[in-house]
A protein has these predicted regions:
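Active-site-proximal alpha-helical scaffolds that flank and shape metal-associated catalytic sites
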Residues: 76-142
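Alpha-helical bundle segments that constitute or directly flank the non-heme di-iron/ferroxidase center
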Residues: 4-20, 29-67, 84-89, 140-142
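Short, well-ordered alpha-helical segments
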Residues: 70-76
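Flexible, glycine- and charge-enriched loops at secondary-structure boundaries
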Residues: 5, 71, 95
Length: 145
């Protein structure tokens, strides 16, 4: 692994441990609890990818004709993260994005994806993010059972 990445991992280890001991994990006691958690957390997974693609668009070159933009180290870091997020591998060796893999796992455990499905449909149909959230009736904290 890249020495800088190893250094960053070491630097954030304390914060990572705080996140890993977050009380939300104690609330997930069974499959039903995991389903409920995933119905909301999937939006964070989607949002992370959207943020990452925004960073890629801003900090690297994604337009044509291609020209090098910004710091090569920054481009490398962003594109390495994009590669990992867009090219995950499932248990059968099939490539898919981390988001698609998460959605597949949700469906396998019987989690309700209707809020996400409505939201994505609204976004695809050109609604703003805020209108898409409103029209999908996304209710944080009240996931569907």
């Amino acid at each position: 692994m890249n020495p800088r990445v190893l250094q960053l991992k070491k630097e954030i280890e304390g914060q990572r441990n705080i996140l890993l001991s977050h009380p939300v994990y104690a609330q997930i006691k069974d499959l039903a609890g995991l389903r409920l958690f995933s119905q909301i957390h999937v939006f964070a997974v989607w949002d992370f990818m959207s943020l990452l693609k925004s960073l890629q668009s801003t900090l690297t070159s994604v337009s044509l004709p291609w020209m090098p933009v910004g710091s090569a180290e920054t481009r490398y870091l962003i594109n390495e993260i994009v590669l990992g997020e867009e090219c995950d591998v499932d248990e059968n060796g099939l490539r898919m994005s981390h988001f698609e893999l998460y959605l597949k796992a949700m469906k396998q455990m019987g989690a309700d994806t209707s809020m996400l499905d409505k939201f994505l449909k609204n976004v695809i149909n050109g609604e703003s993010l805020f209108q898409s959230i409103k029209n999908a009736d996304i209710q944080i904290g009240r996931a569907h059972v």
